[in-house]
Swiss-Prot record:
It comes from Danio rerio (Zebrafish). One of its GO terms (biological process) is translation. NCBIfam families: PRK04199.1-4, uL16_euk_arch. It comes from the Eukaryota. Component of the large ribosomal subunit. Plays a role in the formation of actively translating ribosomes. Plays a role in the embryonic brain development. Component of the large ribosomal subunit. It is found in: Cytoplasm. This is Large ribosomal subunit protein uL16.
Amino acid sequence: MGRRPARCYRYCKNKPYPKSRFCRGVPDPKIRIFDLGRKKAKVDEFPLCAHMVSDEYEQLSSEALEAARICANKYMVKTCGKDGFHIRVRLHPFHVIRINKMLSCAGADRLQTGMRGAFGKPQGTVARVHIGQVIMSVRTKAQNKEHVIEALRRAKFKFPGRQKIHVSKKYGFTKFNTCDFDNMLAEKRLIPDGCGVKYIPSRGPLSRWKALHAN
C-alpha cells in the first residue's frame, strides 16, 4: 500500500502533535540535512540573502521539504559552484500525521471495525508553517542574485499553496541592515562569529570596551 497523498494533510486542522512518549513508532522524517553548501563561510563572504516566504497557513510534508532542498541545491551548484552559496531550510517537521488504515479486500467487514476506535497510527511528519514564515533561506555573493531567485522559484513548485521570494535587506543571515553593517563592523560594535555576528552593546564595563578597541 502506497503513501497517502500529502494533499490529505495540507491544512492545519488539529493541535500540534509531536513525537513523545505517548506518540511512539513515528517514522523518521525524509529530510535529514538542513544546512548545505559552504556553511562554514564567514559572514562577510556572502552578503546577499534571499528567503522563500509562505503566503498560507498550512502543513508541508518532510518529503516536500527534502525535494525542495535537493532542487534548490542542484541549481545553485550548477550555476554558482558548490562553494558559492549556503542554503538553510528553516522549517523542521515535528508534527506527526496519522492514518486509520482501512482494508479493501474481500471479507474486510469481518476483520475491521470501521470508524470505531478510529485514532490512527503515525504515518509521517509535517512542518506547520504560518503566513509570512520563512521556509528556506540562501546566502551568496551579490553577483549571484538572479541565480538565487531562480533556484528558489524552482523549489517553490515542490510545495502546495503560494510562496513569495523576498530578497532581504539584511546582511547575510544576520539581523543587521546591509547599509549599517560595514560601519558597525568598523566601529567594533559587531564581531564576526562564523556565519553570524556578535553584537557588542554600548554599555558594560569600561575595561572591556578599552580591551576591545586596543586590538
